[in-house]
């Protein structure tokens, strides 16, 4: 068949072989699409590692906030840290309060988990419910959760302990806050630093 093409076009066989690949690529719409996709992906891989130029983006992240000193919070005190009233975002999980400000895209006012900002998210995370109805305004003892829900909550707590700064605990009504010294570090964070 190649010999027939040579005879039909009157071209030298070496010219067809060298131009054949390019001819195939540029005459087939599918090949053009695949070539474009490869070029786009290569561009994203090479360009993706470079940070966006500052000042060009509307989504500029605010400068990082200083680390919050350890302290305990009542549910009412925690509500202030929702990313709107205060730029810092705190969430309570299983009685522990975490600073999730660096996860603003997830836990900020416009994020998918924004409903939990400044709140005790334990019940919502344990039951996979992202509605405000899953949240209580007062301390939630979580005693009515099933064993599976408690295990799910424990998994969430482990993830948050690993990823975010643990800043204190959520206080029950009438419970006195713990007085933390400036040098004191929680055990889980010192263990993380030794790894």
Swiss-Prot record:
One of its GO terms (molecular function) is steroid binding. Its main location: membrane. It is a single-pass membrane protein. It is found in: Microsome membrane; Smooth endoplasmic reticulum membrane; Mitochondrion outer membrane; Secreted. GO terms for biological process: heme biosynthetic process; positive regulation of lipoprotein transport; positive regulation of protein localization to plasma membrane. Residues 173-195 are annotated as: Disordered. SMART domains: Cyt-b5 (SM01117). Residues 72-171 form the Cytochrome b5 heme-binding domain. The modification Phosphoserine is found at residues 54, 57, 181. The keyword Nucleus does not apply. Component of a progesterone-binding protein complex. Binds progesterone. Has many reported cellular functions (heme homeostasis, interaction with CYPs). Required for the maintenance of uterine histoarchitecture and normal female reproductive lifespan. Intracellular heme chaperone. Regulates heme synthesis via interactions with FECH and acts as a heme donor for at least some hemoproteins. Forms a ternary complex with TMEM97 receptor and low density lipid receptor/LDLR, which increases LDLR-mediated LDL lipoprotein internalization. Non-classical progesterone receptors involved in extranuclear signaling are classified in 2 groups: the class II progestin and adipoQ receptor (PAQR) family (also called mPRs) (PAQR5, PAQR6, PAQR7, PAQR8 and PAQR9) and the b5-like heme/steroid-binding protein family (also called MAPRs) (PGRMC1, PGRMC2, NENF and CYB5D2). Homodimer. Forms stable homodimer through hydrophobic heme-heme stacking interactions. Interacts with FECH; the interaction results in decreased FECH activity. Interacts with EGFR, CYP1A1 and CYP3A4; the interactions require PGRMC1 homodimerization. Interacts with TMEM97 and LDLR; the interaction increases LDL internalization. This is Membrane-associated progesterone receptor component 1. It comes from Pongo abelii.
